[in-house]
Amino acid sequence: MLSPANGEQIHLVNYVEDYLDSIESLPFDLQRNVSLMREIDAKYQEILKELDDYYEKFKRETDGTQKRRVLHCIQRALIRSQELGDEKIQIVSQMVELVENRSRQVDSHVELFEAHQDISDGTGGSGKAGQDKSKSEAITQADKPNNKRSRRQRNNENRENASNNHDHDDITSGTPKEKKAKTSKKKKRSKAKAEREASPADLPIDPNEPTYCLCNQVSYGEMIGCDNDECPIEWFHFSCVGLNHKPKGKWYCPKCRGESEKTMDKALEKSKKERAYNR
């Protein structure tokens, strides 16, 4: 059995690991969205150059028919620029949702950590109340330096040793119990991490929050975006599409790629070509 002090250290270690799991991938996700916004900005600059050329051509043109054609080109360029602006707004909204979701996860971990602390404090208080007063008065002066030295040694131990250290009362528990406690702790931590990645059920869900993926659920955990501009879903959970990490190059969702892993569905490909031709 672990002492209250070591129990608090274990809960602290678990909290730090949960915290790192929640935020360690956040910079990469945000960087991907920022890169998409830069690509949109580059396309927008190209459209501005086209508009300048069309405007100069419109001023020089004297034929009415040619002027109408140039004016039509200007209108299409303006529509494309508006579409790019809408895409940027959508990306920013996704970034805000991503940060809010990770913030809720961190808040949930904080609540769990505080709950463990409250339980530990209550258990420690009951144990102190039940101690015999005569035993506390019978502690000799020679025992006190040993207790202080033990505390200093525990503070100097690394995170793994901190979870296995025992105080003077726990030495009689034996090596098998220490191994059992360590194995049980690892199993509980792995189970909790798997549950967090599998479902966001333990987090408060906003009823107005948009849904994504094939499962039609809110954004949580690791997600990947489909590189098909015509994709109706756009974002997918890693677990729902069988991914463990982000693949290199372009990635298309099961609905868009059809039977092939590297090509999009023929209907969507045709729609994309028609849209490019109309532009």
Swiss-Prot record:
This is Inhibitor of growth protein 1. Residues 262-279 are annotated as: PBR. In the adult, widely expressed with highest levels in thymus and testis. Zn(2+) 2 binds at residues 226, 231, 253, 256. The record marks 212, 223, 227, 235 as: Histone H3K4me3 binding. Residues 154-171 have a biased composition (Basic and acidic residues). Pfam families: ING (PF12998). PANTHER family: INHIBITOR OF GROWTH PROTEIN, INHIBITOR OF GROWTH PROTEIN 1. Interacts with H3K4me3 and to a lesser extent with H3K4me2. Isoform 2 interacts with RSL1D1. SUPFAM superfamilies: FYVE/PHD zinc finger. A zinc finger (PHD-type) spans 210-259. The gene is Ing1. Disulfide bonds: none annotated. Keywords: Cell cycle, Isopeptide bond, Metal-binding, Nucleus, Tumor suppressor, Ubl conjugation, Zinc, Zinc-finger. Zn(2+) 1 binds at residues 213, 215, 237, 240. Residues 179-191 have a biased composition (Basic residues). There is a cross-link at residue 135 (Glycyl lysine isopeptide (Lys-Gly) (interchain with G-Cter in SUMO2)). Belongs to the ING family. SMART domains: ING, PHD. The lineage of its organism: Eukaryota, Metazoa, Chordata, Craniata, Vertebrata. GO terms for molecular function: histone H3K4me3 reader activity; zinc ion binding. Residues 115-206 are annotated as: Disordered. It comes from Mus musculus (Mouse).
